[in-house]
Amino acid sequence: MRLFLVLFLSLLILPSVLPNQITSDDLIQYRIKSTRAAILDLQSEFGNDYPNARKYLKELSRLEKSFAKGADIRDALKKFRKKALLENPLLRIDGVLCVKRRMPELAEEVLDPKHRKSMFGWGGKVTQGLKALGLPSNHECNSSLSKTGYDNAIVVLDPIHPNREMKTLYTAPDSGYVGEIDLHWNAEKMLFTQSDSMSWKVFEIKIDGSGQRQVSQTPHDVDCGDACYMPNGNIVFGSTASIQSVPCWHGQRRVSNLYAMKNDGSGIRQVCFDQDHNFHPSMLPNGQVLFHRWDYTGISHIYFRQLMVMNPDGTGQRAIYGSNSWFPNSLYFPRALPGSSSKIIAILSGYHGAHRMGQLVILDTHQGFYEEKGLVQRLSGCGQAIEPKIRDNLVDEDWPKFLHPFPLSDKYFLVSAWLEPKGSWGIYLADVFDNLVLVKEIPGYALLEPIPIKKRPEPAIIPSRVDLSKNEAVVYLHDVYAGPGLTGVPRNVVKSLRVFSYDFGYPGMAGAHKIGIGGPWEATRILGTVPLE
């Protein structure tokens, strides 16, 4: 009965979304409510493993009463929230993996508030600084970044004692890039991307920093990275081996598609044959690979970036969010919430502008998959709502900005956040009650890619359906009338389908100035016509 009552009360006091124009007093009241909701949830969820709940609730009530009497409680509330919320039992783990990378200095005139709307402008100082930080623009892959010149390392943070010095696990030699970590669900080893003066490669090390080995085995003119373990023992990763070019860059930048390989780097096979980039592969509990696909194929170029799934062998590819949508432009770094293959946390971002950073959102494909229909919550720490805007530079003016979310549970998350332009990227604890609490930051450095070091359930294994002795495939299209494309067209009117293909451009051979500005940016071919049954 007590458990039910606590849950009921926590639901009653969940903070609502605040209006766009708020005062500092509004924000304090909001954070009192969000903090109370989280404490009640931790008390309900963990009981004696969160022993100070009652004490914290009393202390929060005292702060609330002082605030009602006109006292300035901002500093006291900030300290209290950090103490109470970082005692979350989910943080009692062996540490948090993250990437520590030096941030480039940004000029004061760029950071001036009057330049906030244009600070992520094309070719601007902030844009160049983000690339120096190892963050390619939204329509580029790592191949567009400098291969050397990074001050970075894989480190381990103690979330219970964040003031302790972090342990350095691995530093790339010769100022190479190191990042894009994927921790195996047994928490004993990890994949990561490393660059040298020649190319980008996939490596693996054990959780103690030993046993480093290069996994990807490709020629020096092929880049590899963004790797993810799969439960069948293979690895899915991004590579420029297709030798395609990004059409919006007029053929100047390389495309990264997804490939699969064995654990020793052999047996490389292309599994995504897309016009543009495939990013951020991660595993769903049901055994499917979740990834982000960039599309330009004869559609509204600024707005189509689908979330996709496929089987580990590359079959069964389909969009699960964003097909035919104008909002959001992009959903980067998607990860499934524990135990669910429909609930996903991701970064909502734009087309041009801020590099893959943006709003922290939770989506549920069972709630919807079109525009804002499945976006169930935005987490900002200050009550900001999801606003379905159809806009190119969608999130440039939004603060705070987020990267690399990783769920601790279905309610609590680690995430990298940049609260304001003059700050640093730090590691934060976020929750569904809209709290955002700093775990660790280091002035002058960015702390990115937080991953809790703990064992996770192994995803399901989906048997391979690929017969490599054959060079044909079967495509199932069970209802051409489904979806908005043929809305209002009576059944049995369509008699046949025309099948055509894109010939994706090699470097220097794609782009709007070569084929068409508003239509396809590459050559297309009609393959034939097939009758409908």
Write out the residue ranges for each language-model feature.
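Long amphipathic alpha-helical scaffold segments
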Residues: 47-141, 145-168, 508
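Multi-bladed beta-propeller domains
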Residues: 162-176, 206-223, 262-276, 311-330, ...
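Beta-propeller blade signature
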Residues: 152-159, 203-208, 253-264, 304-315, ...
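Short, conserved, GDST-rich strand-edge loop motifs in beta-rich repeat architectures
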Residues: 101-149, 195, 237-254, 291-305, ...
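Residue-level detector of Asp-centered blade-edge/turn motifs that repeat once per structural unit
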Residues: 91-92, 185-186, 230-232, 284-286, ...
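Loop/turn-rich, solvent-exposed surfaces of beta-rich toroidal or solenoidal domains
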Residues: 337-428
